[in-house]
């Protein structure tokens, strides 16, 4: 295969307020912990089961980090688009440690606020490249998910008559 794809899309809730810090270069970085959950009914017992996965997200895009700092709070529902990266470091005992994170680089990645708890911020989309570095209102046609032109009717995207209830 000539190419490969490293793309992660998450829709989940923040487990804590964003952690904001500055690198030695002065660049702003935001760290998020996002929970995604699923539930199902056990076929043998009929018991309802739940599982939550926690994801570490690192935002190196200054504009997206500012949005996270200003508008995101614990419990906020967000859409994140980034890439997987694994870091390696040594702990205090000299043991190799690894951490896999979803990373939004300076010119790649997307952050979209999905709930209205942030006073009118429903569906605000913030992207990390080209003209997508600006706010755009959620139009019900999928928002700004990297499309280069206007939405073409009902092909793709989200439908306005979908139930707001997430199945997990």
UniProtKB/Swiss-Prot annotation:
Pfam families: SSB. Residues 54-60 bind DNA. Keywords: DNA damage, DNA recombination, DNA repair, DNA replication, DNA-binding. PROSITE patterns: SSB. GO terms for biological process: DNA recombination; DNA repair; DNA replication. The keyword DNA repair applies. A motif (Important for interaction with partner proteins) lies at residues 163-168. Residues 113-168 are annotated as: Disordered. Residues 5-111 form the SSB domain. Residues 147-159 have a biased composition (Low complexity). One of its GO terms (cellular component) is nucleoid. The keyword DNA repair applies. Homotetramer. Plays an important role in DNA replication, recombination and repair. Binds to ssDNA and to an array of partner proteins to recruit them to their sites of action during DNA metabolism. HAMAP family: SSB. This is Single-stranded DNA-binding protein. It comes from Brucella melitensis biotype 1 (strain ATCC 23456 / CCUG 17765 / NCTC 10094 / 16M). The gene is ssb.
């Amino acid at each position: 295969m000539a190419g490969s794809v490293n793309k992660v899309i998450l829709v989940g809730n923040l487990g804590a307020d964003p952690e904001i810090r500055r690198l030695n270069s002065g660049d702003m970085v935001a760290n998020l912990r996002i929970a995604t959950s699923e539930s199902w009914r056990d076929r043998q017992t009929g018991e309802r089961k739940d599982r939550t996965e926690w994801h570490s997200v690192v935002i190196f895009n200054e504009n997206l980090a500012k949005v996270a700092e200003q508008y995101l709070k614990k419990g906020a529902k967000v859409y994140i688009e980034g890439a997987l990266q694994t870091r390696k470091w040594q702990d205090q005992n000299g043991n190799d440690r690894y951490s896999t994170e979803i990373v939004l680089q300076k010119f790649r990645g997307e952050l979209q606020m999905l709930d209205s708890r942030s006073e009118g911020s429903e569906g605000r989309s913030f992207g990390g490249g080209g003209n997508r570095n600006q706010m755009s209102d959620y139009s019900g046609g999928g928002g700004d998910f990297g499309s280069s032109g206007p939405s073409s009717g009902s092909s793709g995207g989200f439908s306005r008559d979908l139930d707001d209830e997430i199945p997990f």
